[in-house]
């Protein structure tokens, strides 16, 4: 399906699964201080203490707390943090529309110091500039270094090589002012459909609104959606669909029929009317058939999308196989998607591997510690990529009083993961630390986590 890059979310995922306890006491004091809204001086003292101890997780917490005011903190640790301070300062500049050359310079420095996440960032910047050849150079470096987001983007882009070459050709003409009207329409449509860059597509196509050119109207509708003008956007989607059954408009209408009305049959009719074989439509048809319990048709459409190398559809097909209890097929398709950089597939694959381990060694099923070495290896990689849910799950591979349970859940809690707050409550409960256990249970509960009757009673003692 269409590639969606959730920039802020992804870029914040820079947490190392450290094997030592350096700086975690100070990190925890900072976290508690932030949650309890303690004074700035206390929080900064502990953030600095954690950074000076070599803790790598503290920079993400500092970024969240300091936001646009983080320059002084990050500058202090440049050339001292394996490129992490440079990375977060680049992120801060990007969020505040800072100088692009400075951002790229910081990221290049971060990459040279071993921060492989910077390769993904640099590649993403060049993608947004429609310089895909350059983007792929950096994404390949990230892929080769084992960075999973770079791997996913590199593999995704590879499937669109011919389209991206054409975009680069047309964009050069556009920038030189030598592009024809038809070429301009082609460029804007490609940027819209293959890059999903609605702002840039609209800038290119806005001159064609007066002639009701479907891609230009669609780009306008997406920007209206972004401004919370849902009704106006849907009105345009209906207009475009009635006009020429434009597949992107059909998807927007079908997805709303499913989400708001659960009208799967009408949604399917809307998609059928487009006669489109785009992976977005094929994959969504599979999803609708799955909800209609027509698993044969669902698999057929997922496979059609997968034949076009759509990674998202691999995940959906894996879920379908799980529903059908065909775990061998689910495992195989998740493994394929994971090898192409899908974090969600890796997560699901780890669950299957753990279940297989339990079947092999039923005598260990009463042991609360998870056992699969293969699953643990996957979760370690995902944790190192910054996925907080994987950090929480990885902590289950250690004895409940092990220091890694605390470290992994602190790293996830710094991202405000509610399960991590609960797990820290349990950890300190087992350590007989009433103050901290009650604190974390309260935070978990305040953030919507069901801590259960026993711990609800415990925090009110």
Residue ranges and their predicted role:
Residues 37-38, 97-98, 130, 162, ...:
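Residue-level detector of the short coil/turn that links helix A to helix B
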Residues 31-32, 64, 91, 124, ...:
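Residue-level recognition of tetratricopeptide repeat
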Residues 43, 70, 74, 103, ...:
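Single-residue signature of alpha-solenoid repeat helices
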Residues 47, 74, 107, 139, ...:
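Hydrophobic/aromatic packing residues within the alpha-helices of TPR/SEL1-like helical repeat arrays
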Residues 15-16:
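C-terminal motif of bacterial Sec signal peptides marking the signal peptidase cleavage site
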Residues 94, 127, 159, 192-193, ...:
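Position-specific recognition of the canonical hydrophobic site in helix A of tetratricopeptide repeat
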Residues 61, 88, 121, 153, ...:
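Canonical tetratricopeptide repeat
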């Amino acid at each position: 399906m269409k590639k969606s890059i959730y920039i802020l979310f992804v870029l914040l995922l820079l947490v190392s699964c450290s094997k030592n306890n350096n700086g975690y006491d100070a990190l925890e004091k900072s976290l508690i201080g932030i949650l309890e809204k303690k004074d700035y001086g206390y929080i900064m003292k502990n953030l600095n203490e954690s950074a000076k101890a070599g803790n790598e997780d503290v920079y993400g917490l500092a970024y969240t707390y300091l936001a646009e005011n983080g320059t002084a903190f990050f500058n202090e640790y440049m050339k001292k943090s394996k490129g992490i301070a440079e990375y977060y300062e680049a992120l801060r500049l990007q969020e505040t529309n800072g100088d692009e050359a400075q951002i790229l310079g910081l990221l290049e420095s971060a990459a040279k110091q071993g921060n492989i996440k910077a390769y993904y960032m640099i590649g993403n910047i060049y993608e947004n500039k429609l310089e895909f050849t350059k983007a792929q150079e950096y994404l390949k470096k990230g892929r080769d270094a084992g960075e999973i987001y770079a791997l996913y983007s590199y593999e995704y882009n590879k499937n669109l090589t011919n389209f991206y070459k054409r975009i680069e050709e047309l964009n050069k003409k556009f920038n030189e002012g030598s592009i024809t009207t038809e070429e301009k329409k082609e460029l804007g449509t490609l940027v819209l459909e293959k890059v999903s860059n609605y702002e840039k597509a609209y800038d290119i196509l806005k001159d064609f609104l007066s002639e009701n050119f479907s891609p230009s109207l669609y780009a306008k509708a997406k920007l209206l959606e972004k401004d919370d003008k849902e009704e106006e956007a849907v009105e345009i989607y209906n207009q475009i669909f009635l006009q020429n059954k434009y597949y992107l408009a059909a998807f927007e209408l079908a997805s709303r029929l499913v989400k708001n009305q659960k009208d799967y049959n009408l949604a399917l009719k809307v998609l059928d009317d487009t006669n489109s074989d785009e992976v977005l439509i094929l994959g969504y048809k599979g999803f609708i058939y799955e909800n209609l319990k027509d698993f044969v048709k669902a698999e057929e459409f997922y496979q059609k999308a997968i034949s076009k190398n759509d990674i998202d559809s691999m995940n959906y097909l894996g879920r379908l196989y799980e529903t059908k209890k065909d775990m061998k097929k689910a495992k195989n398709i998740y493994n394929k998607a994971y090898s192409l950089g899908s974090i969600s597939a890796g997560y699901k694959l780890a669950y299957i591997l753990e279940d297989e381990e339990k079947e092999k060694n039923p005598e260990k099923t009463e042991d609360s510690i998870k056992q699969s070495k293969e699953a643990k290896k996957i979760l370690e990689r995902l944790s190192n990529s910054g996925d907080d849910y994987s950090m929480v799950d990885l902590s289950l591979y250690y004895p409940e009083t092990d220091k890694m349970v605390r470290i992994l859940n602190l790293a996830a809690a710094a991202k405000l993961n509610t399960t991590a707050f609960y797990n820290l409550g349990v950890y300190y409960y087992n350590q007989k630390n009433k103050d901290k256990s009650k604190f974390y249970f309260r935070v978990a509960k305040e953030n919507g986590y069901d801590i259960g009757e026993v711990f609800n009673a415990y925090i009110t003692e």
